[in-house]
Amino acid sequence: MLCTSPVNCLDSVCCTSINISSLVRRAALTHNDNHFNYEKTHNFKVHTFRGPHWCEYCANFMWGLIAQGVRCSDCGLNVHKQCSKHVPNDCQPDLKRIKKVYCCDLTTLVKAHNTQRPMVVDICIREIEARGLKSEGLYRVSGFTEHIEDVKMAFDRDGEKADISANIYPDINIITGALKLYFRDLPIPIITYDTYTKFIEAAKISNADERLEAVHEVLMLLPPAHYETLRYLMIHLKKVTMNEKDNLMNAENLGIVFGPTLMRPPEDSTLTTLHDMRYQKLIVQILIENEDVLF
């Protein structure tokens, strides 16, 4: 038997049954059928359980009256605090726990929906490429803020069923604005805090070939969901530059727009941000111009 019952009213059959249930659930989480196989750490928070609970990692009883263990707020996994240090990065978020699309961790969102990229990115880019590639000042011209907020609320409310068609939003700048807002609202930027400094250092390399190689090496450090989303965005932005005659947007212009959107320094420093802006622009410009080589 895997545990000893803490109270007389719980017989050994009940205890064993609960333990087996925990182990089955743990196995299901470990061997989930997520085709894209993105790793995600659990988002554990101290939790007070009502009634008897067993750790879903070690299968032992969680003793105490308050704060007996921790629960993952994304998938609901319950474990001892000390066991949480050993749980693998196999969080499979439950859609019921994902309350919104914007401001949600990117990997959490794609794992919950079992998609390669956030649906916002796919849907907005499809709409922009269908009717906006020749629009002058694409991504540089801003749409009405309240309409952009409407699109955000539509995605948060309706998910992939959100209607952003020309019938509802004829101004394509509203859709580009909603896409940029999604990237700005990410708690961890597309180009993560962990890789930010390395990208900036790569941008400072004077030799073009060495700089490209350095950028490629740092790209490999991005989490898979971030890498895939960035790759898809750069392919799209390359298409935007191919219509420069009409939209007047080249890779440098897009770098100015997307640099601060995709890259944020780990420390919230105005001086750092101002100092790094030219390197942020350059990184995005390099990614666009060399997307076929870098990705």
Curated annotation (Swiss-Prot):
The record's annotation in InterPro entries points to: C1-like_sf (IPR046349), DAG/PE-bd (IPR020454), PE/DAG-bd (IPR002219), Rho-type_GAP (IPR051854), Rho_GTPase_activation_prot (IPR008936), RhoGAP_chimaerin (IPR037860), RhoGAP_dom (IPR000198)
Using the UniProt record, give the first listed, main subcellular location: membrane
Q: Which residues form the Rho-GAP domain?
A: 104-295
Q: Which GO terms describe its molecular function?
A: GTPase activator activity; phorbol ester receptor activity; zinc ion binding
Q: Where are the zinc fingers (Phorbol-ester/DAG-type)?
A: 41-91
List each coiled-coil range: none
Q: Which domain of life is it from?
A: Eukaryota
- Tissue distribution: Found in cerebellum and testis.
Q: Which Gene3D superfamilies match?
A: 3.30.60.20, Rho GTPase activation protein (1.10.555.10)
Q: What does UniProt list under activity regulation?
A: In the inactive state, the N terminus protrudes into the active site of the Rho-GAP domain, sterically blocking Rac binding. Phospholipid binding to the Phorbol-ester/DAG-type zinc-finger/C1 domain triggers the cooperative dissociation of these interactions, allowing the N-terminus to move out of the active site and thereby activating the enzyme.
Instruction: Enumerate the subcellular locations listed in this protein's record, separating them with semicolons.
Output: Membrane
UniProtKB keywords:
GTPase activation, Membrane, Metal-binding, SH2 domain, Zinc, Zinc-finger
Tell me which Gene Ontology terms the entry assigns under biological process: acrosome assembly; signal transduction
Q: Which GO terms describe its cellular component?
A: membrane; synapse
Membrane-related topology note: Peripheral membrane protein
Q: Annotated site (Arginine finger), which positions?
A: R140
In UniProt terms, what function does this protein have? GTPase-activating protein for p21-rac.
Q: Would you tell me the protein name for this molecule?
A: Beta-chimaerin
Corresponding gene? Answer: Chn2
